[in-house]
C-alpha cells in the first residue's frame, strides 16, 4: 500500500475502535444552477410572506457572527 493509503486505513481503524462507523450521504449540489434557482425562489417566497419579520428574527437569533466567533 502507499503511505497515504496506510495512513487512511490506520485512521479509519482507530475511529472504528472508538465505536464509530463511516456514513455516506448524498446532498444537493449547491453549485448547480437548478439548486440556486430553487433557493432563490424559496427565499423570495419567505421574504414576501406575512411572517417575514418573525422569520428573519429567528434566522438572526440562530446565526453566528463569524468575526466575533
From Swiss-Prot:
Keywords: Repressor, Toxin-antitoxin system, Transcription, Transcription regulation. Disruption phenotype: The mazE-mazF operon is not essential. A triple TA mutant (missing vapB-vapC, mazE-mazF and phd-doc TA systems) survives antibiotic challenge, suggesting the TA systems are not required to generate drug-resistant cells. However the mutant is more sensitive to oxidative and heat stress, and does not survive long term starvation during aerobic growth on complex medium. There is a difference in the level of branched-chain amino acids, which may play a role in monitoring the nutritional supply and physiological state of the cell. The keyword ATP-binding does not apply. This is Antitoxin MazE. The lineage of its organism: Bacteria, Bacillati, Actinomycetota, Actinomycetes, Mycobacteriales. Forms a complex with cognate toxin MazF. InterPro entries: MazE-like. Antitoxin component of a type II toxin-antitoxin (TA) system. Neutralizes the effect of cognate toxin MazF. In M.smegmatis 3 TA systems (VapB-VapC, MazE-MazF and Phd-Doc) may be involved in monitoring the nutritional supply and physiological state of the cell, linking catabolic with anabolic reactions. The keyword Ribosomal protein does not apply. It comes from Mycolicibacterium smegmatis (strain ATCC 700084 / mc(2)155) (Mycobacterium smegmatis). Induction: Constitutively expressed during exponential growth and early stationary phase, it decreases in late stationary phase; part of the mazE-mazF operon. Negatively autoregulated by one or both of MazE-MazF. The gene is mazE.
Amino acid at each position: 500500500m502507499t503511505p497515504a493509503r496506510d495512513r487512511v486505513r490506520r485512521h479509519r481503524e482507530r475511529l472504528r475502535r472508538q465505536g464509530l462507523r463511516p456514513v455516506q450521504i448524498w446532498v444537493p449540489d449547491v453549485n448547480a444552477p437548478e439548486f440556486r434557482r430553487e433557493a432563490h425562489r424559496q427565499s423570495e417566497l419567505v421574504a414576501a410572506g406575512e411572517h417575514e419579520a418573525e422569520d428573519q428574527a429567528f434566522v438572526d437569533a440562530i446565526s453566528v457572527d463569524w468575526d466575533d466567533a
